[in-house]
Amino acid sequence: MKKYLAIINPISGTGSKKSIPELLGQAYSSADGELFLTYTKAAGHAEELARRAAEEGFEEVIAVGGDGTVNEVARALLGTNTALGIVPKGSGNGLARSLGIAMNSEEAIRQLSTGRRICIDSCTMDGRPFFCTCGMGFDAAVSHAFAEASSRGPVTYF
């Protein structure tokens, strides 16, 4: 029996994630397998959860959150047979946008349930893989300030 894991970051982005478990449950109820849900508790937790899921032979790990959550999960799945699914719920959702994943949760989950898979490239900087963007100088300073900010949304960039 196939196993699927949704890793939900409860503090990513600005939108509510209350409907996500039900939407995922509906989409994966017809799948030949079982869906498990878990929530992150701190930075780095998604990577740990995803790594464990890959080791246990999960078919797919679904990152529900922003680029940080997606990067953590994707890093853990590198070199495994476990697929990465994305439900964008962050402030920027850069990787999801570049892959054509819907920003609407219901539509993104519908896209996941089609079973379509693609391979994506990764890059490594200072021994750390990443999947969407990399910046230096001012770009990196803005990214760092955003990561340290207590609020989320586009206004945080100003």
Regions found by a protein language model. Give the residues of each.
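Active-site-adjacent beta-strand anchor residues
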Residues: 36-39, 63, 85, 132
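Short Gly/Thr/Asp-enriched flexible loops that form oxyanion-binding sites at enzyme active sites
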Residues: 69-82
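Short glycine-/acidic-enriched loop or helix-start segments at secondary-structure transitions
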Residues: 17, 72-74, 96-97, 141
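Glycine-rich beta-strand-to-loop/alpha-helix junction loops that act as flexible
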Residues: 10, 64-66, 87-89
